[in-house]
Amino acid sequence: MNINATLLGQAIAFFIFVVFCMKYVWPPLMAAIEARQKAIADGLSSAERAKKDLDLAKANATDQLKEAKLQAAEIIEQANKRKAQIIDEAAAGAHSEREKILAQGRAEIEAERHRAKEELRKQVAALAIAGAEKILARQIDQAANSDIVDKLVAEL
């Protein structure tokens, strides 16, 4: 056998092998590789979109958090103003109620004092009449009259 014929036979066999591989083996391998490349590219683009969406969501969450904090601060401020208003109203009401009670107490004290004065006048008048009766009934000397007047003064 000649080396050239062997070489030619091997070249033909190799050529047939290459054609066979290109016809039946290569297309499924290329399809699998292309599918894998497409899947990887889709995954990367999906990851990129997800990253952008995440950044956008973080920005939105930060904005909403800031807005919520501002609203909370505003609500707290309104509550503090309302609290101060309620305290002022209560203080004004308590002050007016205090003045009313004091005025009523003063009026009661004045009425009681007036009643006590009237009672005292009645008692003084009764004592004066009783003293005058005793003086007229006894009609003794000046010393006895002075003694009766002194007793009346002591009773007053």
Curated annotation (Swiss-Prot):
NCBIfam families: ATP_synt_b, PRK05759.1-2, PRK05759.1-4. Its main location: membrane. Belongs to the ATPase B chain family. F(1)F(0) ATP synthase produces ATP from ADP in the presence of a proton or sodium gradient. F-type ATPases consist of two structural domains, F(1) containing the extramembraneous catalytic core and F(0) containing the membrane proton channel, linked together by a central stalk and a peripheral stalk. During catalysis, ATP synthesis in the catalytic domain of F(1) is coupled via a rotary mechanism of the central stalk subunits to proton translocation. Component of the F(0) channel, it forms part of the peripheral stalk, linking F(1) to F(0). SUPFAM superfamilies: F1F0 ATP synthase subunit B, membrane domain. The chain crosses the membrane at residues 11-31. It comes from the Bacteria. It is found in: Cell inner membrane. Keywords: ATP synthesis, Cell inner membrane, Cell membrane, CF(0), Hydrogen ion transport, Ion transport, Membrane, Transmembrane, Transmembrane helix, Transport. The keyword Transport applies. InterPro entries: ATP_synth_B-like_membr_sf, ATP_synth_b/b'su_bac/chlpt, ATP_synth_F0_bsu_bac, ATP_synthase_B_chain. Signal peptide: none annotated. It is a single-pass membrane protein. The gene is atpF. Disulfide bonds: none annotated. This is ATP synthase subunit b. GO terms for molecular function: proton-transporting ATP synthase activity, rotational mechanism; proton-transporting ATPase activity, rotational mechanism. It comes from Aeromonas hydrophila subsp. hydrophila (strain ATCC 7966 / DSM 30187 / BCRC 13018 / CCUG 14551 / JCM 1027 / KCTC 2358 / NCIMB 9240 / NCTC 8049). F-type ATPases have 2 components, F(1) - the catalytic core - and F(0) - the membrane proton channel. F(1) has five subunits: alpha(3), beta(3), gamma(1), delta(1), epsilon(1). F(0) has three main subunits: a(1), b(2) and c(10-14). The alpha and beta chains form an alternating ring which encloses part of the gamma chain. F(1) is attached to F(0) by a central stalk formed by the gamma and epsilon chains, while a peripheral stalk is formed by the delta and b chains. One of its GO terms (cellular component) is proton-transporting ATP synthase complex.
